[in-house]
Amino acid sequence: MEEKENVNLVEKSNYVALENTREIDVFDEFLNAIGNENTITPVYADSSLTHLRKKSYTKVVHDCTYALVINPYDKKVIWRRGLAYLRLGHPHLANRDWEHSLELDPNNTYIQKSLHRLKEVYYIYRECAETWQLRHLRVASSQQLPVGLRKQYPNIIRGKIWWKKVHDNCQLCGQQCELKKENLSAMRSMLYMANTYAKDDTENHSPSAQIGIESSEDELENKITKGEHSLLVPEELYRSNYPCPQNIDQFLYMIKVLSAPCLYIETFSFPISTINQLFKAHGMSVEQLNLFLKSIHYIGLCSRFCKQWSDKARSLMQALSGLPWFSFVVQHCLHITAAQILLHIPDIQEEEFRNWHVSKKPINNTDLSSEFEIAEIPINCYT
């Protein structure tokens, strides 16, 4: 028995040593390639183009980064990496690469148009966010909640609500909270921490984190979705000045940001006709949609609520959870991660999640973003 155990230990040690030598050989190969850029650079450039056509954008960034280490002045590779960054939801990185590519090729009109379009769309997004930050429009009587709920929440229905900068007071009741020392940014901090953990998990499993070790994109996505902290939230959602939607356009925009944060730069909003068809297909009327808009207005992002208003928001959600269409909207329109944000009230109970048909853990669910693709940009700008 002891001899067999010794043999197994020797085999394991030999296997580990072999794997280590393979990694060392791959790294040495890459270092040697730096001195022989004429033969190796086209290999990375061709593979990046292949991955770009297959929409494997993480591998495109991986190959383009290697190619740029060898030759940092390759215009094709710089353009492709910027395009991959844009598809992955990093417009600022795409802007950086495209500006670098434009410096190398200032007469390229296509890059100029793409940069102008990118900055224009991003500016429109920021302008709308700032506009919604300042005010909420007056709600017509036909779009208000039933009389019983209006009596329960009188201060929210009446008039206009002007959003101010973050302060120590509750932004809904407009008065100083009884517990003035209460940390109103606790929930935003939790969302920020979840974002940090999710990004760290993504970086640890990224192909560029380990030289020479390839991992398929499907395996990478499975590792991320199965992780405990896999909630990637746009930065606008855990900042205190993000407004609640008050009309159909703002509602559609919020759905877009929450359901597909990596796409909201390119596809700015859903077509209203599509969302109307979706509601009609499930027997939902415009009045029900308006009721849901008002429920979002009350709930908002619960990170801005003091404890008093969090309790009232919870009771409102319990009242709305009895409606047959509410669980469908939560599950299919806002998607599971958005529902977690909207229902993330302090000291939430598991029973309440079950009543709302929402799970605490992220699950693979169908969202509206799968029906809408990014506006295509030709990938053969330099080919």
Swiss-Prot record:
<dbReference type="GO" id="GO:0044732">
    <property type="term" value="C:mitotic spindle pole body"/>
</dbReference>
<dbReference type="InterPro" id="IPR019734">
    <property type="entry name" value="TPR_rpt"/>
</dbReference>
<dbReference type="InterPro" id="IPR011990">
    <property type="entry name" value="TPR-like_helical_dom_sf"/>
</dbReference>
<dbReference type="GO" id="GO:0065003">
    <property type="term" value="P:protein-containing complex assembly"/>
</dbReference>
<dbReference type="GO" id="GO:0005829">
    <property type="term" value="C:cytosol"/>
</dbReference>
<dbReference type="GO" id="GO:0051321">
    <property type="term" value="P:meiotic cell cycle"/>
</dbReference>
<dbReference type="GO" id="GO:0005634">
    <property type="term" value="C:nucleus"/>
</dbReference>
<protein>
    <recommendedName>
        <fullName>Meiotically up-regulated gene 93 protein</fullName>
    </recommendedName>
</protein>
<dbReference type="GO" id="GO:0032153">
    <property type="term" value="C:cell division site"/>
</dbReference>
<feature type="repeat" description="TPR">
    <location>
        <begin position="75"/>
        <end position="108"/>
    </location>
</feature>
<keyword id="KW-0469">Meiosis</keyword>
<dbReference type="InterPro" id="IPR051966">
    <property type="entry name" value="RPAP3"/>
</dbReference>
<keyword id="KW-0963">Cytoplasm</keyword>
<keyword id="KW-0802">TPR repeat</keyword>
<keyword id="KW-0539">Nucleus</keyword>
<comment type="function">
    <text>Has a role in meiosis.</text>
</comment>
